[in-house]
């Protein structure tokens, strides 16, 4: 099997941070070479843009926000993702372009056609081989976000914003079931872990 590009995505409060540890443990047990990274971020340029994008004081317009996301992504692809895959290393990214379609597209209203143009220009033919989409009901997402001590620029949005974000995620997953695995993360940690491990076992033929 060629090196796999796997993404972990979902609305805020879906449990990505918790379940990244599950994925890391799965790769460690199997002794597979893997690189974990994140978006926006993963490079010095990407991390600098992340600070701007998540800062509640940032007053960026929708197009500027979207372009910053893709600028960070281009650096990420060129400096991190493609070199790792070329070296035979699997890559797991905490968020990728699905998040742009969901947040800037669904949440903010950026036309999907415009995002697709940037996607093709920045990524070429690069697409994830597998996307683990963590999903929780809107009220669960909002409750978990509400527990955060400090909310970033996106976490400060209202429920209707996250309702649209979640809708885009689920629509994209339904349109391409061969790439997406939707994981109900409104369950116990053990149940969610078992679901993720089952998906990874099936994908890698373990």
Swiss-Prot record:
Keywords: ATP-binding, Kinase, Nucleotide biosynthesis, Nucleotide-binding, Transferase. ATP binds at residues 10-17. One of its GO terms (molecular function) is ATP binding. GO terms for cellular component: cytosol. InterPro entries: P-loop_NTPase, Thymidylate_kin-like_dom, Thymidylate_kinase. The keyword Kinase applies. Gene3D superfamilies: P-loop containing nucleotide triphosphate hydrolases. Its EC number is 2.7.4.9. SUPFAM superfamilies: P-loop containing nucleoside triphosphate hydrolases. It holds the Pfam family Thymidylate_kin. GO terms for biological process: dTDP biosynthetic process; dTTP biosynthetic process; dUDP biosynthetic process. It catalyses: dTMP + ATP = dTDP + ADP. Phosphorylation of dTMP to form dTDP in both de novo and salvage pathways of dTTP synthesis. Belongs to the thymidylate kinase family. This is Thymidylate kinase. It comes from Neisseria gonorrhoeae (strain ATCC 700825 / FA 1090). The gene is tmk.
